[in-house]
Amino acid sequence: SVSSVSAKNVEGFKTGSVMEALGGQVAGVQITQTDGTPGSGFDIKVRGIGTMTGDASPLYIVDGFQVDNINYLANSDIESIEVLKDASSAAIYGARAANGVVMVTTKSGKTGRPVVSYNGSTSYRKISKMLDLLDPYEFVKLQMEVNPSKYAHTYYRTGEDDNGVPYRYQSMNDYIGVQGVDWQSETFRPTWSQDHNLSVMGGNDNTKYTLSFSRYNENGIFNNSGFDKTSGKFRVNQKVTKNVSFDATINYSNTNKKGAGTSGDSGRFNMLAQILSARPTGGLALTNEELLAAAIDPLELESSESLAQVNPIMQTQSVTNTKRSEMWSGNLSVTWEIIKGLTFKTAGTYNTTNTRTNIFYKNGSKEAYRNGQKPYGQTQMGRDLRWTNYNNLTWKQKIKKHSYDVMLGQEISFKSSEYLLGQAKDFPFDNMGNDNLG
């Protein structure tokens, strides 16, 4: 079967990804974001999970050309999206379509005088409802019920300390009504996003063109996180002669993503897990202010090699994780109607993507703590290149009551990936970050 999504349904979503706008609009298609930070990638399952170990991603076709993903496209540049979910996709694209096909058609020029269009928006977002977690009294009560011997004299104690000062909490009831640390409110923040789109299109019977520019920016819900995307496209359709025409497109995309992330380091060190498991009170040892300022919760420190609880606020501030990606692509197709019913088409595409990822862990991060409380960082650079050439000869003819459609095709493609990783540990100080990597 084939499911279609129109431009109107995609443009209405002010997001930095076409995949995010596509979510929930096609029955039987599951789209999940790999991480909670803005600009994170998406996993899409069109026909369920067809493999336990291999890649289950669908085949992406944009304006007739195969691409690795559609992250570079702007929502405002989409004309339509079709998702092929059954065996019909394999009949067209072969084994590559085993996991389904996502076919995208972008906007092209139309006959008429030049039309300049602009649309922009600003959005404000915040968490409408936080999780209802334990307050200090409920938390202390639970700890004493679970392990009273371990937490004896940790949260309350009768009498005075060595300096003759009465203990702040003499009994469990002293915690009733005490305001604790709300880690959710301290870590999460309201966010703003902006989306701007400018396009020019027009043409005549022989030449049609479109030029578009898009800019999207979003702040993350965590401090020191966010995403911005700049994309542009120029497309021209030219009828050279009565029987010859060509279609050329140039695409550009630049994305910048930053943030510590939410799903990395699974288990108890997951960022969201750290927020939900952090103590609302420091007990007798720490005030709320001291608990907020502690990079590592001393009570939850298990040994010199391991730790159970880090400060999620300081984690977002002490981790620098940025990724920059720049993509260029060019597509060209030439169609020649040799005789009536017999058409030859040759098409080529070239795509190159350069990425640079910088990660630096300052003092106060759990990663630096694991490294003997010394900062460390890494830089990774990558380059992906793909080019493809298609050649098709098609014969369509209707003879009496019979219709014939015969196609002879040939394709050659090339893809390469190069990566370079540099890593250093035991930085004497963290002021320079990865600039001191050498």
Model-derived features: positions:
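Surface-exposed loop/interface segments of Gram-negative outer-membrane beta-barrel transport/assembly proteins
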Residues: 110-179, 190, 220-225, 231, ...
